[in-house]
């Protein structure tokens, strides 16, 4: 290239720019760069040679020849100089040309370093991918395979590829990697980025060639490289987001999810397989034609390697020869396939479903298809699977007994019970709806009558009562509606004590004289309500408790001080309030004869537990505490669980308690005559045992008289209430029994607990001749 030639082109361009001004400026720029384009064209041949070699040869050539570089599109643009720089070169501006050359050399050095770093990065990436492909385990490859299937599922939803988990995994990887092998599957361009990550260890050489071609194509066009890097970044970001969502929420629920652990996966595939009779030749091209002709058809690929209908997970990496079966089912989706499988399980339509396919295929293919269908739903119903082996090599044939029923007796019973339940429920629903319709129809008629009455000028009822003899229509008042009174009548018959029935009947009686029906029904209600009340009173036993103690004292007797107020001394102290003896506090009891002491506590107070735990020697126990009583004193004993003391036994002790009370006066304790020897052996209940204390002025009384008045007893027993006729429930009822005594002189008294001598302590249940004591009250009155 000479500078003179450049000057001539400069003059031509300047004159041309002056004539055409700014309109033809772009065309002149092209003429100015003509020489540079020639240089670029001469270097394109070298670029093609360099691209045909691998990346390692390129680095060696560049290091050996410092001035020669492989020029891609980006490098060609670097050699293009601007117009002012070109004019300076033409005008022999040596200084500018030298500076430009220096800048150009610096740029070349920087680009050389950049290319070297890029080449090193690519080599590192290749080595890293190569090592990962060698060291990756089987589970990682399986996960990548599932990702590809999930990616293909989003693109094609009408293609179902049903295979055994491990066999389809090995076969599909060999199809995707070995593109030169016959019977391959064509990977679309959208899946090349994912296919590069799925390389088995046995195919390392082919993975290297694949990566070298990728790097060579990447070095050809840097602009395309930038765009592809951006697309790769977006794919990585999208993949990470997708992975996070799947880790948190799980895989999306689609038709390929497993129903059972043994159910095969329904994976959506991008590629279609060819027909069964093509003998595995030109699979991809033939199936593309099929897709163009029949766009609505679905292709099912069924590969099976079963051992007695049990999926084997052994020898995953062993490349075994497995025949591939193709079945075309028109107008089906995954749900239809599952429905057909369920029909096969019941043994109803399986022969008609696969009839055409069985006529075209050989026995091996038929066995292979049946085994895969059994794996979809691994329930064997009358199948002869005696000769089925691991690899389905032998020509075994599975016979189906269509004459036999596939339903078990349990299934028949459940089916019959379900039918009975459905029939009963449908019958009830039909009758309920029929009754509802009748009620609805009745009220609609009433509403229509009300509307006609409102629209008519006079309140004339549409339904007129006719007299048979006279055939005279009687007008009825619209407000004379006895429906509410009728409802009240039927509700009153249900109630046991119909107070509201009577009140409602009286209220409805207060109606105008024209409302004859309402009045008649109100009178009927009142009459029956009164009858029900009378019947209720006569048949009901009202249980009125007898008062514990009730004494009426005349005012003059109190004024005369005949019965002065009582005094209660306890532990040498006078108590104006009452004393309570129960299980809330600890009390001591001693034997009447041996003076042995027994203690009572919570849940062990004068009951069956107390006797079975303490087992006293005597049948009479006295309180260890002495209570000094004077004047009017009230003593009350509350009995718990136990029977009443029989009337026959009461007759035996009745003479000791006759003629003690005069009218409503207190019982004078001095009149009591019962002693320790008079107490019967079979008595059970409580008692008050008192002994008189002699003061100094009574010392003149002789000793026989003192011995005669030594102790006096008054007994308390559980008795039936006067107004209570429920004798059966008295066993569990707590009944208080009390009496008011008058002590003229001071007595030392003890509370007594009595039970029969013949009682058994080890008896579990409460005996019939025993009663518990819950509480004892002593109160000055």
From Swiss-Prot:
User: Where does this protein come from, organism-wise?
Assistant: Plasmodium falciparum (isolate 3D7)
Q: What is one term from the GO cellular component aspect held by the record?
A: cytoplasm
Start-end of Low complexity biased regions? 91-100
Protein's membrane topology: Multi-pass membrane protein
**Locations of Acidic residues compositional bias?**
1-12
Compositional bias (Basic and acidic residues) at which positions?
115-129
Subcellular location as annotated: Membrane
Superkingdom per UniProt = Eukaryota
Region Disordered: start-end pairs: 1-29, 45-66, 91-130
Q: Which UniProt keywords apply?
A: Membrane, Merozoite, Transmembrane, Transmembrane helix
| Name this protein carries in UniProt | Uncharacterized protein PF3D7_1205000
Which stretches are transmembrane? 487-507, 520-540
Practical applications according to UniProt: Possible candidate for an effective malaria vaccine as determined by epitope response in sera.
Q: Basic residues: which segments have biased composition?
A: 101-114
